[in-house]
């Protein structure tokens, strides 16, 4: 019917569909498929495959990059259009809401990153932070260490307390995983855990220089805040882990099995942290 109306009047498909309150996508789906619509169907299947493989974590830009890596060449706007038409909406982290630590670090270290460019190589600057993880009817606490060059999570620790041992465990894991040189910078907020004697002794023992954000200014440590937001949006979706074992297993799978090795990072020109580090190693 729509075709006959457009053929007998000066109105286009858009206007006729608006008057009849029929979605244009329904009309095009019912109409005899064109070469373009056939190509759209094939592209949509590829988009679906990537979207499902990444559990709804990828928006159109990352999917477009993933398609290109598979030699499927198209415009990003086309991917966006097809995703909108099929209701594929990526998980979104909550808007960054500044949160302060207890700010109780004794003799806080200066901010060595202020007005400095991001590092050009791995193991030049690490950053750390702590966040709350909902588990059953209680909270656990996750401490991470991230390499600011590659955005790779190089160490993490999960515990039911906020003592300094939490951040020490995360740093110990990072030190075991990486080969560092003297003068590596470790940056954090002014939390008492990072200002504790035991943590500072650990840094000193490995010739690591400590850097801290200005008090009540978490924007100075936005890299770790960004990761925490991504983790909660893409794993929890406002839910809770069943228990501590479930939380530990899922966080391990997310960090070591996905975030570091499979997830494309926009800040790395849409490559993964592991591939980014490999490219730097080859270049040097």
Model-based region annotation:
Residues 1-284:
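Charged DNA-binding/catalytic regions of mobile-element recombinases
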């Amino acid at each position: 019917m729509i075709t006959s109306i457009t053929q007998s009047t000066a109105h286009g498909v858009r206007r006729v569909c608006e008057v009849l309150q029929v979605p244009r996508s329904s009309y095009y789906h019912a109409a005899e498929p064109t070469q373009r619509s056939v190509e759209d169907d094939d592209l949509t299947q590829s988009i679906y495959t990537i979207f499902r493989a990444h559990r709804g974590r990828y928006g159109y830009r990352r999917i477009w990059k993933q398609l290109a890596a598979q030699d499927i060449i198209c415009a990003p706007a086309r991917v966006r259009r097809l995703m909108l038409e099929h209701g594929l909406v990526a998980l979104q982290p909550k808007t960054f809401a500044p949160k302060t630590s207890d700010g109780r670090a004794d003799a806080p270290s200066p901010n060595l990153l202020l007005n400095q460019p991001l590092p050009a190589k791995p193991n030049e600057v690490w950053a750390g932070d702590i966040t709350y993880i909902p588990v059953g009817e209680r909270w656990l606490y996750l401490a991470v260490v991230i390499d600011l060059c590659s955005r790779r999570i190089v160490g993490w620790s999960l515990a039911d307390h906020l003592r300094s041992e939490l951040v020490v465990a995360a740093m110990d894991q990072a030190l075991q995983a990486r080969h560092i040189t003297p003068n590596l910078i470790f940056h954090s907020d002014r939390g008492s855990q990072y200002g504790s004697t035991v943590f500072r002794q650990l840094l000193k023992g490995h010739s690591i220089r400590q850097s801290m954000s200005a008090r009540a200014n978490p924007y100075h440590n936005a890299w770790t805040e960004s990761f925490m937001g991504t983790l909660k949006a893409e794993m929890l979706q406002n839910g809770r882990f069943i228990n501590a074992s479930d939380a530990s297993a899922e966080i391990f799978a997310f960090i070591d099995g996905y975030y570091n090795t499979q997830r494309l990072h926009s800040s790395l020109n849409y490559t993964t942290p592991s591939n980014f580090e490999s490219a730097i190693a080859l270049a040097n």
